[in-house]
Amino acid sequence: MSMSNIVVFGGDSHPELVTKICENLDIHPSKVELGKFSNGETNIALRESVREKDVYIIQSGCGQVNDTFMQLLILISACKSASASRVTAVMPYLCYSRQPDIPYTAKGAPIISKPKENYTFESHPGTPVSSSLMTQRPGAESSLKSLDSAIRSTINLENPQPIRTPNSSATANNNFDIKKTLSFSRIPMIPGGKLQNTSNSTDAGELFNAQNAGYKLWVVQAGTLIAHLLSAAGADHVITMDLHDPQFPGFFDIPVDNLYCKPIAQNYIQHRIPDYQDAVIVSPDAGGAKRATAIADALELSFALIHKERRSQLLKGPPDATLTSGGSLPVSPRPLVTTLVSSQNTTSSGATGVAALEMKKTTSTSSTSSQSSNSSKFVQTTMLVGDVRNKVCIIVDDLVDTSYTITRAAKLLKDQGSTKVYALITHGVFSGDALERIGQSSIDKLIISNTVPQDRTLQYLGKDRVDVIDVSCIIGEAIRRIHNGESISMLFEHGW
């Protein structure tokens, strides 16, 4: 194919990146009108023919995320309706990529299974089975058997009497109890509900838990939905960079090419960081360890890992402070103060093996003395694995949003003797007060790519503290190779 058959449209999320990608391809962005109607609906008009053309639509998932994504969907649909031969969505930062969920079928049924031997409860309502199977099952008594025992207990076998219709109040009560026993297995009793019987509170609670066993708390995660929306709009291909979750392409039924910022990051470390040979690559959490070790191995540098124990432990306390499933913590009479207690392990060789940082939420000193020693506390542990004393540390992460992770990691590294801390990030979203937090943190320099516009970052932190690395060369080369039917595997290791 010739490059004359290619058409590149750009959304309004990142016009600067669109221009740079087109400069690398030595073409001009195609003309498109982007706007909104008075009621806020997206309005798009294509100003160039796309019939039988290879169309690439560049739109990063930043800014007003929902508006930009809807704009992308309408652009894809418009190009497909205008007889484009192929439409590729180029999303340097794929929005909603941090919300992957379990894949589900097109009808909405989750593709999830549980080993049958792990089920320890009967289905409600129960599966119909023959009475012989119910009575012969070891360790189980059916409702019919209990009814049979109740009837036999009222019959005198030595002096048999004619069976009469029971009319006494006692017999009526017994029959009512039997009916209640039979109906209990089919009517769920919610603990604390209006139908709750105090005598059967334990059984009802067990029944309620059994019915909801295996039920996933319905926190909606839009991973599969985003993939289906792009496919339904008419996208034939997706190009993105440094996906937060590597399993995300599995949600698509169209090809997905996930590019990497690793070659550009390695090039920056080699040419822009003094004495990088003695630096340490640091992963701020266990999830990014594979990404960080890939750079460390390629540059033959040391590696360190910061492990966060997110599951808080409730220590022994009064009964009213016990946290159960679905419960809530009692309101503290005083604000909680976070105390950082660092412990440093040193060996005879002088190397620091594992440094632990304990974060304990306790009350202030004045309130602690007045409380009992067994008051409830939460303990959260952060461990640094690796030697960073007198070393330059480079924190490598794919995405920064609130910046809590990298700022806490930088503080821990400085506490453990690091001389300088760099933060090398692919996608800098920086929502809320993230930039203010970074400005007050121990991060000496922030290196970030331009998959998301960084004008506000440069304005707030200054050019002396921020370096923006350009990824348009990798994305442009990927578009050229895909358009010409060439392999893009070289871009994963060597870049453009």
From Swiss-Prot:
The modification Phosphothreonine is found at T120, T127. It is found in: Cytoplasm. GO terms for molecular function: ATP binding; kinase activity; magnesium ion binding; ribose phosphate diphosphokinase activity. Pathway: Metabolic intermediate biosynthesis; 5-phospho-alpha-D-ribose 1-diphosphate biosynthesis; 5-phospho-alpha-D-ribose 1-diphosphate from D-ribose 5-phosphate (route I): step 1/1. The keyword Membrane does not apply. Keywords: ATP-binding, Cytoplasm, Kinase, Magnesium, Metal-binding, Nucleotide biosynthesis, Nucleotide-binding, Phosphoprotein, Transferase. Mg(2+) binds at D242, H244, D253, D257. The modification Phosphoserine is found at S123, S183, S332. One of its GO terms (cellular component) is ribose phosphate diphosphokinase complex. It is an enzyme of class 2 (transferase). One of its GO terms (biological process) is purine nucleotide biosynthetic process. It catalyses: D-ribose 5-phosphate + ATP = 5-phospho-alpha-D-ribose 1-diphosphate + AMP + H(+). The modification Phosphotyrosine is found at Y119. PROSITE patterns: PRPP_SYNTHASE. Its EC number is 2.7.6.1. Belongs to the ribose-phosphate pyrophosphokinase family. 5-phosphoribose 1-diphosphate synthase involved in nucleotide, histidine, and tryptophan biosynthesis. Active in heteromultimeric complexes with other 5-phosphoribose 1-diphosphate synthases (PRS2, PRS3, PRS4 and PRS5). Present with 3310 molecules/cell in log phase SD medium. This is Ribose-phosphate pyrophosphokinase 5. The lineage of its organism: Eukaryota, Fungi, Dikarya, Ascomycota, Saccharomycotina.
